[in-house]
A protein has these predicted regions:
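Active-site recognition of the HExxH zinc-binding catalytic motif
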Residues: 54-66
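Metalloprotease/metallohydrolase-associated module, dominated by Zn2+-dependent proteases
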Residues: 1-50, 66-125
Length: 125
């Protein structure tokens, strides 16, 4: 798999658009033991103790392209992170941080963690 700068830009824009369009409950922070992020059809979970920005791109790419292999997802994540300008990364992080804050604030206000059965997205490896 090869991605030129135009394709990388499209992936970035699609990921940013997805962050903007999903409800705050779609993005969750939690401590994880053996992974840094998980992608389900219902939400994306990120370990807040790890590299959130690359992990968020990685999990969003799993959501956007469930047919891609893990190596293709890692490649796309690396290309986006290394091709984006600091302003593009900051813009992505701002929208993601706003969603994460709203979700965590709602959980705190309600006094409990949101829990539900999840169906993991299956993808080729």
């Amino acid at each position: 798999m090869k991605l030129n700068k135009g394709e990388v830009k499209k992936l970035y824009e699609e990921a940013l658009s997805l962050v903007k369009s999903k409800p705050p409950e779609f993005f969750n922070l939690r401590k994880m033991r053996d992974t840094v992020g998980l992608c389900y059809w219902s939400d994306i979970e990120l370990d807040y103790r790890r590299d959130i920005i690359p992990t968020a791109f990685h999990e969003l790419f799993h959501y956007m392209r469930p047919d891609w292999s893990e190596s293709n997802i890692k490649y796309a994540e690396s290309r986006v992170i290394n091709t984006c300008t600091p302003l593009e990364v900051a813009t992505f992080f701002k929208y993601l941080a706003d969603k994460l804050f709203e979700c965590e604030f709602k959980k705190e206000q309600s006094g409990h963690q949101i829990s539900h059965k999840k169906r993991k997205i299956k993808y080729n490896q």
